[in-house]
């Protein structure tokens, strides 16, 4: 996977709507080439590459955690209300402040994190079992989606701006916007790595994990917070980017097995490579028209989702 990620990095760096030779790109990287090339590479392509890497890592680790602690192989940030919370906050902000498009990332982050805290409280009040987390998330998602639909009916003029956010994309992202999300994603990844042995025991079942000394409710709650914080961080700069948190954990487990300490780095690498490749394809295949990475991920993820559903029915 490291080789695939490196290849993805090179493709993202050298390909774009503006054609440049490899020599031009390398000179621009070091600030010694033509000014227009330096701007394209250093101000546009590099921040976008970093955003794609962070989005891939954040959503993949979030999905892996959610699938591990809930015991549901279809769990993802979408299902526990993170994306719905972000979407509701975004459309509410647009309805109250129609010109505040620049505030959408911040509002989305607050909405996603508020949804996370609510899910944690709900799950904790009913002993944070893996079933209660999923049910609480589904209920919250349904309520928030109803709220989004209601606001859309009352304020139809906000639909266009909201749709741009809900599709998910990395166009126009800057390095400054990535600082806080990067810190949250790295901290979540580090804490997950520390808790990997206990998460692996949690995958054996609550009773067996408890008999082995794992504080089941505490570990599940911490993992839920890490997963949601990581996903919320991605939402703040990439919008509602779907399917990554669903499909990448399955790819990682097929490559290295289900042990969390092996699946975690594999998921991070796979997710980073997948989103980076998807974004590169989206901005180059139909150049100069750009296809948002959210659409590319949906084209890849929807068939994969159907395969998972069919596989689950056969196992059932």
Task: Give the role of each language-model region.
Residues 1-316:
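Alpha-helical transmembrane segments in inner-membrane proteins
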């Amino acid at each position: 996977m490291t080789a695939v990620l490196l290849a993805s990095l090179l493709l993202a760096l050298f390909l774009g709507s503006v054609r440049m030779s490899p020599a031009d790109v390398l000179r621009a990287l070091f600030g010694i080439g033509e000014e227009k090339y330096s701007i394209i590479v250093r101000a546009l392509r590099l921040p976008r590459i970093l955003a794609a890497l962070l989005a891939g890592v954040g959503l993949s680790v979030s999905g892996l955690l959610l699938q591990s602690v809930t015991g549901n192989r279809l769990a993802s940030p979408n299902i526990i209300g993170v994306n719905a919370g972000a979407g509701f906050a975004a459309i509410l902000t647009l309805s109250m402040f129609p010109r505040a498009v620049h505030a959408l990332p911040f509002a989305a982050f607050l909405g996603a994190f508020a949804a996370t805290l609510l899910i944690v409280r709900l799950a904790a009040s009913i002993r944070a079992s893996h079933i209660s987390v999923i049910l609480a998330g589904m209920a919250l998602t349904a309520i928030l989606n109803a709220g989004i639909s209601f606001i859309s009916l009352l304020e139809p003029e906000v639909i266009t701006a909201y749709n741009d956010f809900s599709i998910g994309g990395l166009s126009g992202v800057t390095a400054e916007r990535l600082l806080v999300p990067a810190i949250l994603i790295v901290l979540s990844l580090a804490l997950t790595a520390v808790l990997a042995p206990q998460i692996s025991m949690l995958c054996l079942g609550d009773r067996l994990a408890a008999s082995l000394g794992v504080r089941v409710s505490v570990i599940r709650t911490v993992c839920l917070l890490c997963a949601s914080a990581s996903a919320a961080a991605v939402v703040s700069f990439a919008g509602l980017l779907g399917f990554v948190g669903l499909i990448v954990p399955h790819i990682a487990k097929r490559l290295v097995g289900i042990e969390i300490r092996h699946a975690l780095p594999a998921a991070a690498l796979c997710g980073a490579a997948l989103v980076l490749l998807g974004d590169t394809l989206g901005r180059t295949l139909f150049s100069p028209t750009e296809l948002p990475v959210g659409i590319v991920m949906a084209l890849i993820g929807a068939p994969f989702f159907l395969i998972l559903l069919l596989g689950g029915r056969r196992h059932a």
